[in-house]
Amino acid sequence: MSTFQHVIQTEADLRAILGYAGGPATNKVISEIDDICRAYIESSPFVLLGTSDATGRMDVSPKGDPPGFVQVMDSHTLLIPDRPGNRRGDTLTNLLQNPHIGLLFLVPGRKETLRVNGTAQIVRDEAVRDRLSMQGKAPVFVIAVTVQEAYFHCTKCMVRSHLWTDEHKNDALVSLGVAIIQHAQLDISREEADAYLAEDEQTGLY
């Protein structure tokens, strides 16, 4: 592990360099999902979920589906379907220990992002699960988020990254199959791993 010589350890030291936010940067935070936020969420096919366990160990998990897959139940409640995955349950087990959650919504082609913070429960109500069905299959679990904060994040990171262009497209990276073989120390070929993942993409979505 690297040893650094100049490490910020107090907020006073941080603020002496960073300064303080003011105006719109602080006033933009609202405590509910208004019509503007609702429209963005209903247009979003992708959201990142940040959670932590009781010790503070963090995890960020991506969720994706057709636009509007996260439903606005009311101005203070969001419903997120938990589709089939690898059964690790990182987000779910974290929420059982610590209900706090942070969401980051993206809409392809848009430079702004929407941040939502709150608390969450794992629910199994049949009516709730049914309203989030895809291809005739209801999610096993639904993450119900009680919204405490909602605000739009500025566009600078998207402008810097050129995320929605092909400028940084990289086909030279190894396949996911190769990465899993190496990291999980599997005794299978790249072709077998890639074939399994390709089939899972077709048959295991819902």
Protein language model regions, located:
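Binding-site signature for planar aromatic cofactors or substrates
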Residues: 1-206
